[in-house]
């Protein structure tokens, strides 16, 4: 049995299938962990949802910002953008089934036996793993309830940008969603920045600090696997592994086998515009 990890697919299913074949992934005995953003800029978002859903218990996914945006668009809260290439999902005969399945997926997942956990964007510096699980679960319960439209309608916005245990209601949920699906940089005081998408090496970053480089209030006892940040080009250190290597932007898709740290790479065509 092997455990495979992959970053943002964004509808680039052919690239994922190529990597899984190269790695000799076997659904009946292996696990595939996907760090969110299954859909959006690539050509096969519909087919990607069908494939991952079909893997059933062999696949673990966490929701990304594009996945949440798809749910909002499908429910008429936002209008579809041509560049997101999700119309095929909205028009599909199994659209309702796929969207219901997507809505039931978590924002955060921790492997039960291996020392890693996954969220799409990362974990804010104020939280430990137990808190992350708790706060993510609060949002998941709401998203999976009959009141999910209220959450989808009110999740957009960049504030609050700093965690407080006193946050309640939609402000609490919005911080959690932003931290787990949109965060890249923080300010030195721990406030989230929702705008900058640059590489940390770019001089225009200024005082901003990658979320994983800020001093943490509590040490995380698992390595954090995340996607979302293509400009990192697959950053890895003893604490984190970033697996978005920019497939949709014409760079590559990376599949990591946890047990021996083997990496499988596939050069990709540009799909984002």
Curated annotation (Swiss-Prot):
Top-rank taxon: Bacteria
Pfam family, one: Metallophos
Enzyme class of the recorded protein, top EC level: hydrolase
InterPro entries: ApaH, Calcineurin-like_PHP_ApaH, Metallo-depent_PP-like
Catalyzed reaction equations: P(1),P(4)-bis(5'-adenosyl) tetraphosphate + H2O = 2 ADP + 2 H(+)
Annotated CDD domains: MPP_ApaH
Keyword Hydrolase carried by entry: yes
Molecular function per GO: bis(5'-nucleosyl)-tetraphosphatase (symmetrical) activity
Keywords, ordered alphabetically: Hydrolase
Enzyme Commission number: 3.6.1.41
Family: Belongs to the Ap4A hydrolase family.
Function of the molecule: Hydrolyzes diadenosine 5',5'''-P1,P4-tetraphosphate to yield ADP.
NCBIfam families assigned: apaH, PRK00166.1
Record's protein name: Bis(5'-nucleosyl)-tetraphosphatase, symmetrical
């Amino acid at each position: 049995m092997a455990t495979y990890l992959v970053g943002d697919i964004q509808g680039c299913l052919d690239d994922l299938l190529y990597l899984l074949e190269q790695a000799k992934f076997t659904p009946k005995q292996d696990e595939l962990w996907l760090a969110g953003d299954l859909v959006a800029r690539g050509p096969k978002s519909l087919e990607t949802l069908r494939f991952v859903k079909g893997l059933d218990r062999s696949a673990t996914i966490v929701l990304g910002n594009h996945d949440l945006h798809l749910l909002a668009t499908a429910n008429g809260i936002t209008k579809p953008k041509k560049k997101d290439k999700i119309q095929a999902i909205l028009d599909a005969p199994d659209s309702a089934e796929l969207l219901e399945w997507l809505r039931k997926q978590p924002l955060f997942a921790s492997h039960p036996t291996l020392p890693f956990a996954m969220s799409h964007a990362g974990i804010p510096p104020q939280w430990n793993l137990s808190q992350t699980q708790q706060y993510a679960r609060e949002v998941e319960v709401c998203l999976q309830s009959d009141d999910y439209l209220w959450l989808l309608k009110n999740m957009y916005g960049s504030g609050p940008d700093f965690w407080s245990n006193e946050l309640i209601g939609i402000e609490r949920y919005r911080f959690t969603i932003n931290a787990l699906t949109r965060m890249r940089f923080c300010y030195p005081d721990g406030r989230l920045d929702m705008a900058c998408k640059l590489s940390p090496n770019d001089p225009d970053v200024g005082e901003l600090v990658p979320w994983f480089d800020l001093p943490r209030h509590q040490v995380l006892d698992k390595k954090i696997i995340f996607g979302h940040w293509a400009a990192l080009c697959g950053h890895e250190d003893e604490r984190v592994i970033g697996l978005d290597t920019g497939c949709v932007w014409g760079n590559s898709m990376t599949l990591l086998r946890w047990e021996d740290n083997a990496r499988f790479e596939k050069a990709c065509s540009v799909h984002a515009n």
